[in-house]
């Protein structure tokens, strides 16, 4: 059985649905595990913790591009050690249909772009 780590609050939204499907998964957030993932030192702590798991799911979206930053921290370690699977939850908001000053679409677009880069590594396109 795979060990799953989820960055997200299991009492809310998509993380709650993941908890229903995978009740043995471990969840971390400000309220679960005392990890405020907007703080770089906590992102590094998450990355180290993730090494004990086979699958990492990034659900928690935190302002100022923190979701992309904490996915990067996890990915750096996992790439170095050829470890597991990363699933990052994006949003259709990354392709807005009208102009907006809201940063959320830009943050999700950055996450999508970063994850595409990661997929090229896993596909061996850098060899």
Task: Cite the ranges covered by each PLM segment.
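Short glycine-/acidic-enriched loop or helix-start segments at secondary-structure transitions
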Residues: 15-17, 67-68, 98-99
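Rossmann-fold scaffold of SDR-type NAD(P)-dependent oxidoreductases
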Residues: 7-8, 53-63, 70-71, 85-91
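Hydrophobic/aromatic beta-strand patches that form the interior of the parallel beta-sheet core
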Residues: 26-28, 57, 87, 127
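Adenosine-cofactor binding site in Rossmann-like domains, unifying the SAM/SAH pocket
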Residues: 25-48, 62-69
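Catalytic loop of short-chain dehydrogenase/reductase
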Residues: 61-62, 79, 84-124
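Canonical Rossmann dinucleotide-binding motif of NAD(H)/NADP(H)-dependent dehydrogenases/reductases
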Residues: 1-28
